[in-house]
Design a protein with these regions (language model features):
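Broad phosphate/nucleotide-binding scaffolds in NTP-utilizing and phosphate-metabolizing enzymes
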Residues: 1-256
Protein backbone atom coordinates (compact mmCIF):
# COMPACT_ATOMS: atom_id res chain seq x y z
CA UNK A 1 0.00 0.00 0.00
CA UNK A 2 2.85 2.37 0.83
CA UNK A 3 4.36 1.77 -2.63
CA UNK A 4 1.04 2.61 -4.29
CA UNK A 5 0.79 5.86 -2.32
CA UNK A 6 4.32 6.84 -3.32
CA UNK A 7 3.57 5.94 -6.95
CA UNK A 8 0.40 8.05 -6.96
CA UNK A 9 2.23 11.02 -5.41
CA UNK A 10 4.87 10.79 -8.14
CA UNK A 11 2.15 10.63 -10.79
CA UNK A 12 0.40 13.70 -9.37
CA UNK A 13 3.72 15.60 -9.35
CA UNK A 14 4.28 14.53 -12.95
CA UNK A 15 0.84 15.73 -14.04
CA UNK A 16 1.30 19.09 -12.31
CA UNK A 17 4.76 19.45 -13.85
CA UNK A 18 3.49 18.72 -17.36
CA UNK A 19 0.54 21.10 -16.95
CA UNK A 20 2.95 23.80 -15.78
CA UNK A 21 5.21 23.18 -18.79
CA UNK A 22 2.32 23.39 -21.27
CA UNK A 23 0.83 26.41 -19.50
CA UNK A 24 4.08 28.37 -19.35
CA UNK A 25 4.94 27.56 -22.97
CA UNK A 26 1.48 28.64 -24.10
CA UNK A 27 2.03 31.97 -22.33
CA UNK A 28 5.38 32.40 -24.10
CA UNK A 29 3.73 31.48 -27.41
CA UNK A 30 1.05 34.09 -26.72
CA UNK A 31 3.79 36.72 -26.46
CA UNK A 32 6.05 35.76 -29.38
CA UNK A 33 3.54 34.01 -31.68
CA UNK A 34 6.29 31.75 -33.02
CA UNK A 35 4.86 28.22 -33.33
CA UNK A 36 8.17 26.62 -34.33
CA UNK A 37 9.86 28.18 -31.30
CA UNK A 38 6.97 26.94 -29.14
CA UNK A 39 7.37 23.34 -30.39
CA UNK A 40 11.17 23.44 -29.95
CA UNK A 41 10.94 24.62 -26.34
CA UNK A 42 8.11 22.25 -25.48
CA UNK A 43 9.99 19.30 -26.98
CA UNK A 44 13.16 20.02 -25.03
CA UNK A 45 11.31 20.46 -21.74
CA UNK A 46 9.31 17.25 -22.18
CA UNK A 47 12.47 15.36 -23.15
CA UNK A 48 14.16 16.58 -19.96
CA UNK A 49 11.54 14.55 -18.04
CA UNK A 50 11.42 11.54 -20.36
CA UNK A 51 11.84 11.23 -24.14
CA UNK A 52 8.71 9.04 -24.20
CA UNK A 53 6.59 12.13 -23.56
CA UNK A 54 7.90 13.73 -26.76
CA UNK A 55 6.78 10.65 -28.71
CA UNK A 56 3.32 10.77 -27.12
CA UNK A 57 3.03 14.51 -27.78
CA UNK A 58 4.02 13.95 -31.42
CA UNK A 59 1.39 11.22 -31.87
CA UNK A 60 -1.29 13.32 -30.17
CA UNK A 61 -0.48 16.46 -32.17
CA UNK A 62 -0.33 14.59 -35.48
CA UNK A 63 -3.57 12.71 -34.75
CA UNK A 64 -5.38 16.01 -34.16
CA UNK A 65 -3.75 17.99 -37.00
CA UNK A 66 -1.97 20.32 -34.58
CA UNK A 67 1.33 20.11 -36.48
CA UNK A 68 2.23 20.13 -40.16
CA UNK A 69 4.52 17.69 -42.00
CA UNK A 70 7.55 19.93 -41.51
CA UNK A 71 7.08 20.03 -37.74
CA UNK A 72 6.35 16.30 -37.63
CA UNK A 73 9.59 15.55 -39.49
CA UNK A 74 11.41 17.79 -37.04
CA UNK A 75 10.00 15.80 -34.11
CA UNK A 76 10.87 12.53 -35.86
CA UNK A 77 14.48 13.66 -36.20
CA UNK A 78 14.49 14.61 -32.53
CA UNK A 79 13.23 11.22 -31.32
CA UNK A 80 15.57 9.42 -33.74
CA UNK A 81 18.51 11.47 -32.42
CA UNK A 82 17.45 11.82 -28.82
CA UNK A 83 19.57 13.43 -26.09
CA UNK A 84 21.75 11.02 -24.10
CA UNK A 85 24.49 11.09 -21.48
CA UNK A 86 27.12 8.64 -20.24
CA UNK A 87 24.83 7.28 -17.52
CA UNK A 88 22.69 5.77 -20.32
CA UNK A 89 25.54 3.41 -21.31
CA UNK A 90 25.83 0.06 -19.55
CA UNK A 91 29.59 0.14 -19.96
CA UNK A 92 30.31 -3.14 -18.16
CA UNK A 93 27.89 -5.12 -20.34
CA UNK A 94 29.09 -3.48 -23.57
CA UNK A 95 32.76 -4.17 -22.81
CA UNK A 96 32.06 -7.74 -21.69
CA UNK A 97 30.02 -8.53 -24.82
CA UNK A 98 32.54 -7.00 -27.23
CA UNK A 99 35.43 -8.87 -25.58
CA UNK A 100 33.60 -12.20 -25.63
CA UNK A 101 32.51 -11.89 -29.27
CA UNK A 102 35.75 -10.27 -30.49
CA UNK A 103 34.26 -6.98 -31.61
CA UNK A 104 36.32 -3.80 -31.80
CA UNK A 105 34.65 -0.42 -31.31
CA UNK A 106 36.80 2.09 -33.25
CA UNK A 107 35.16 5.15 -31.68
CA UNK A 108 35.27 3.75 -28.16
CA UNK A 109 32.64 2.48 -25.76
CA UNK A 110 31.34 5.93 -24.88
CA UNK A 111 30.63 7.30 -28.36
CA UNK A 112 27.37 6.04 -29.89
CA UNK A 113 26.76 7.11 -33.49
CA UNK A 114 23.06 7.51 -32.84
CA UNK A 115 20.62 7.63 -29.94
CA UNK A 116 16.97 6.67 -30.08
CA UNK A 117 14.31 6.73 -27.42
CA UNK A 118 15.01 3.14 -26.34
CA UNK A 119 18.54 2.39 -27.53
CA UNK A 120 22.01 3.69 -28.31
CA UNK A 121 23.77 2.59 -31.50
CA UNK A 122 27.49 1.88 -31.86
CA UNK A 123 29.74 0.95 -34.79
CA UNK A 124 31.93 -2.13 -34.41
CA UNK A 125 34.24 -4.40 -36.41
CA UNK A 126 34.71 -8.13 -36.00
CA UNK A 127 38.26 -9.02 -34.96
CA UNK A 128 38.93 -11.56 -37.69
CA UNK A 129 40.20 -11.75 -41.26
CA UNK A 130 36.96 -10.36 -42.67
CA UNK A 131 37.00 -7.32 -40.34
CA UNK A 132 33.25 -7.08 -41.03
CA UNK A 133 31.50 -3.91 -39.96
CA UNK A 134 28.62 -4.45 -37.53
CA UNK A 135 26.00 -2.40 -35.75
CA UNK A 136 25.61 -2.74 -31.99
CA UNK A 137 22.21 -1.68 -30.72
CA UNK A 138 22.06 -1.46 -26.93
CA UNK A 139 19.19 -0.48 -24.66
CA UNK A 140 19.76 2.58 -22.51
CA UNK A 141 20.69 1.64 -18.97
CA UNK A 142 17.61 1.14 -16.76
CA UNK A 143 15.36 2.03 -19.72
CA UNK A 144 12.75 -0.55 -18.72
CA UNK A 145 12.30 0.99 -15.27
CA UNK A 146 12.19 4.50 -16.75
CA UNK A 147 9.60 3.45 -19.31
CA UNK A 148 7.48 1.72 -16.68
CA UNK A 149 7.52 4.87 -14.53
CA UNK A 150 6.69 7.04 -17.54
CA UNK A 151 3.84 4.76 -18.62
CA UNK A 152 2.39 4.66 -15.10
CA UNK A 153 2.49 8.45 -14.99
CA UNK A 154 0.74 8.68 -18.35
CA UNK A 155 -1.99 6.19 -17.48
CA UNK A 156 -2.65 7.93 -14.16
CA UNK A 157 -2.82 11.29 -15.95
CA UNK A 158 -5.24 9.88 -18.54
CA UNK A 159 -7.53 8.72 -15.74
CA UNK A 160 -7.55 12.18 -14.13
CA UNK A 161 -7.94 14.03 -17.44
CA UNK A 162 -10.77 11.72 -18.55
CA UNK A 163 -13.08 13.71 -16.25
CA UNK A 164 -12.52 16.79 -18.43
CA UNK A 165 -14.94 16.60 -21.43
CA UNK A 166 -12.73 18.55 -23.84
CA UNK A 167 -9.89 16.05 -23.38
CA UNK A 168 -12.09 13.18 -24.61
CA UNK A 169 -12.69 15.15 -27.80
CA UNK A 170 -9.01 14.78 -28.72
CA UNK A 171 -8.93 10.98 -28.07
CA UNK A 172 -5.81 11.44 -25.95
CA UNK A 173 -6.33 8.20 -24.01
CA UNK A 174 -6.58 6.20 -27.25
CA UNK A 175 -3.38 7.75 -28.61
CA UNK A 176 -1.49 7.08 -25.37
CA UNK A 177 -2.58 3.43 -25.11
CA UNK A 178 -1.76 2.73 -28.76
CA UNK A 179 1.73 4.22 -28.52
CA UNK A 180 2.45 2.61 -25.15
CA UNK A 181 1.90 -0.84 -26.69
CA UNK A 182 4.16 -0.01 -29.66
CA UNK A 183 6.92 1.21 -27.35
CA UNK A 184 6.66 -1.85 -25.11
CA UNK A 185 7.19 -4.09 -28.14
CA UNK A 186 10.35 -2.14 -29.01
CA UNK A 187 12.03 -3.24 -25.78
CA UNK A 188 11.85 -6.94 -26.69
CA UNK A 189 15.02 -7.52 -28.73
CA UNK A 190 14.39 -11.24 -29.31
CA UNK A 191 11.03 -10.34 -30.84
CA UNK A 192 12.77 -7.71 -32.97
CA UNK A 193 15.18 -10.34 -34.31
CA UNK A 194 12.23 -12.65 -35.03
CA UNK A 195 10.59 -9.86 -37.04
CA UNK A 196 13.81 -9.17 -38.96
CA UNK A 197 14.12 -12.87 -39.86
CA UNK A 198 10.48 -13.02 -40.94
CA UNK A 199 10.76 -9.95 -43.17
CA UNK A 200 14.02 -11.24 -44.68
CA UNK A 201 12.33 -14.53 -45.57
CA UNK A 202 9.30 -12.77 -47.06
CA UNK A 203 11.49 -10.44 -49.12
CA UNK A 204 14.12 -12.93 -50.25
CA UNK A 205 13.06 -12.51 -53.89
CA UNK A 206 13.14 -8.70 -53.80
CA UNK A 207 16.64 -7.73 -54.89
CA UNK A 208 16.27 -4.13 -53.75
CA UNK A 209 15.41 -5.08 -50.13
CA UNK A 210 18.23 -5.83 -47.70
CA UNK A 211 17.48 -6.80 -44.11
CA UNK A 212 20.34 -6.93 -41.55
CA UNK A 213 21.30 -10.32 -40.13
CA UNK A 214 21.40 -10.35 -36.33
CA UNK A 215 23.55 -12.61 -34.17
CA UNK A 216 20.80 -14.28 -32.14
CA UNK A 217 23.31 -15.89 -29.77
CA UNK A 218 24.47 -12.47 -28.56
CA UNK A 219 20.94 -11.33 -27.72
CA UNK A 220 20.07 -14.61 -26.01
CA UNK A 221 23.08 -14.10 -23.74
CA UNK A 222 22.76 -10.30 -23.50
CA UNK A 223 19.02 -9.47 -23.83
CA UNK A 224 19.76 -5.73 -23.94
CA UNK A 225 22.00 -5.95 -27.02
CA UNK A 226 21.57 -6.71 -30.73
CA UNK A 227 24.62 -7.18 -32.95
CA UNK A 228 23.75 -7.11 -36.65
CA UNK A 229 25.38 -6.68 -40.02
CA UNK A 230 25.88 -3.12 -41.21
CA UNK A 231 24.03 -2.05 -44.37
CA UNK A 232 24.92 1.17 -46.15
CA UNK A 233 21.96 3.36 -47.01
CA UNK A 234 20.19 6.65 -46.47
CA UNK A 235 17.20 7.65 -44.38
CA UNK A 236 13.85 8.09 -46.09
CA UNK A 237 13.94 11.88 -45.53
CA UNK A 238 17.27 12.02 -47.39
CA UNK A 239 15.86 10.67 -50.68
CA UNK A 240 16.16 13.24 -53.52
CA UNK A 241 12.80 14.62 -54.60
CA UNK A 242 13.26 13.43 -58.19
CA UNK A 243 13.49 9.83 -56.89
CA UNK A 244 10.23 9.97 -54.92
CA UNK A 245 8.08 8.27 -57.57
CA UNK A 246 10.39 5.33 -58.26
CA UNK A 247 11.02 4.85 -54.54
CA UNK A 248 7.28 4.94 -53.81
CA UNK A 249 6.70 2.12 -56.30
CA UNK A 250 9.29 -0.01 -54.51
CA UNK A 251 7.69 0.72 -51.15
CA UNK A 252 4.29 -0.37 -52.49
CA UNK A 253 5.78 -3.64 -53.76
CA UNK A 254 7.44 -4.18 -50.40
CA UNK A 255 4.15 -3.55 -48.61
CA UNK A 256 2.40 -6.19 -50.70
CA UNK A 257 4.88 -8.92 -49.76
Amino acid sequence: MYNNIVKNIKSVNFLLNVLFIFGSEMMIYGIFRDYSFFIDRLTMRLASINILYVKIFQAFALNNNLIDDKTNNKLLKFTDNAPWDYSDINLYELVEMSDKYNIRLPFGYEKPINAGMISLVFIGYEKNDSNEKVIIKMKRKNIQEKLDDAINNLLFSMYILSFIPIINKYQLSEVVNKNVEIIRHQTNFIKEIDNMDKIRENCKHLKYVKIPIANRQVTEEYPNIIVMTHIEGIKINQIPENDYESFAKLVVKFGLV
